[in-house]
Each structure stands twice: as C-alpha cells, then as structure tokens.
Amino acid sequence: LAYISPEAETEKHRAEVGTAYLDFQVGKSQILPDFRNNASELDKINSTIRSVTSDKNITPKGIILKGYASPEGSYASNDRLSDNRVKALRDYIRSKNDFPQSFFTLENEPEDWAGFKAQAEADYDMPARDEVLSIINSDLQPDQKEAKLRALKSGSAFSYVLKNIFPSLRRSEYRIDYTVREFTVEEGREIIKTRPQQLSLSEMFAVANSYETGSKEYNDVFEIAVRMYSSDPVANLNAANISIGKGDYESAKKYLSKAGNSAEAIHARGVIKLIEGDLDGAETLLKQAKEAGVIDAAANLRELQKKRDDNALFDSFNMHN
C-alpha cells in the first residue's frame, strides 16, 4: 500500500466560531449583561475568546461579527438597529480584551429572510405555510412582504412566526481567526491527544511515522487525521490504507470515494479488487498505478498473476476429475 505525505501548510489558519442569542430592549442597542439570558450568552463569547487568547500556541488575527435581525418593523429601522447592536457587541468584547478596533470586521443582516425561509420550509405546523413561503419568495420589498404577512389569515400566521421563528433569527454570529505555530514531532505527539485541530496534515503524517508502521498509535493518527480533515483526498487515502490493513474493506471503499484519483488512490482501489477476487478489474487499476510510478504496484501485479495461475491450476484439476 502506498501512503502520501501531505503538503505542508505555509501558515496554519484556524477559526473558532459561535452564535450568541443576545436579548435587547425593544428598539435599543445597549448590551445589558443581566437582561434575560444575556449572562450565559456573553459567557459563551467570552469563553471562546479566552480559549484563543490563553493558548500560547496561537496568535489571534481578527474577529468577524455579524448581527442578524428578524423581519419585524421597518427595514430602515432594522438596518440601523442591527448595525448598532453589532457595534455594541464589538465594544463589549473590547471592554473585556485588549483588542484594537481594527481587529474587528463588522457585518449585519438587517432582516434575515433567508433564515426565515429555511425555518418556514421545515415547519409543517405553521398556519398558512404555503402562503407564507409564497410571500417570502416574492419580489416585493421587505416592508411590503411584512405587510402582507401581517394581513394573512387575520394575523394568525404572523403571530405564529413572531413567537416561534423570529426569536431564533435575532442573533450574533462570531468568528475568531487565528494562526497556530509549527510543532516538532515530539510536541505533535502530545498535541494530537488534546487539540488535534492545531496540527496540519503534514505534522500528523510526521507524528504517525514516528511510530512503528501498523502499530495502534500509527493507525490512530491516520484515523484522527481523516476526522479532522474529512474532505481531504490525502487524509482519506491514508485512512483507506489503514482500513485495508485491518481487513475493513467497506470503510476503505468509503474513504477511497473521497480520495481523488492520484496514482496511490488508484493503486489502493486495485488492491481491494485483488483481495475481493476481481482480477480483471484489479489488473486494470494496478497497471495504471504502476505506469504512474507506484512502486508497490509491481509486487501486487505479481501476486495477481500467482492468483491467476492458481485459479488455472484449480480449474485444470477439476476438469480432470
């Protein structure tokens, strides 16, 4: 089996993300920590920021804040309000941390019609659901849409969304961008146990190769790698090879479906076909892999020929008996 060494990241960019549901007094943008459930929501934000600022391996690079409001009231008013509220959140974070104003990127969604649509589509208990969706999807201006919603079914549909959907649309999404320093193999052996997301794929590969090939530790690292980088072709190929080594061919096929078409991935698919007895399919793939430079392909083609010879001998024996 042929493993691939991943390319090194020139700089390891990572992010912590979250959503806070802060409550504001009607028409106001001041953050009141003791108002309703704000204390626990602010704790979530502070905890996420602390997880970054307290880690000596991390350099914070910036915070993106995006405020969302629900489609209730005039669009112009909601635009002002969501803008002021996201600025208030920035100022609150700055009051707790030594971040310059330039550290922040602010965005706002005055009325979250996309979120409203997604929730309406999923809510089959909503009164006049089809009519509500028709209004949401129309080309009307936001304030005109709201007026039509308020008039629908004598206001029962709007009362429903006001209570059951709009509260969850009013939120602040935050993302803290940071970079992570490089680790030695010895450091990587420890970091992978507690904060694997801080390791690059190439660092994980180096950690894996510091263990005996096929050992539990070796296999564990590749399995962690594919969990952390689930869509990466290299991580999936290496995990597939581990699964083949364990005899877990179904898992190997699942990983190989996301492993791309590198010579090594083609080789691994050929190995599975060889094991499963599809000698013609295996030969096609193994020859492709050999031509593309996979050294192990030649040995597997010899193994394939031995199987063909054994099958021919077996068939010949049966014919004479």
Over which residues does each language-model region extend?
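Structural motif corresponding to the intra-repeat A-B loop/turn of tetratricopeptide repeats
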Residues: E212-S215, K246, E276, R308
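TPR alpha-solenoid repeat register
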Residues: A235-N236, A265, A297-A299
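Periplasmic OmpA-like peptidoglycan-binding domain that tethers envelope proteins to the cell wall
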Residues: S70-Y174, K246, L274
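Residue at a conserved register position within TPR or TPR-like alpha-solenoid repeats
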Residues: N209-E212, S243, K273, Q305
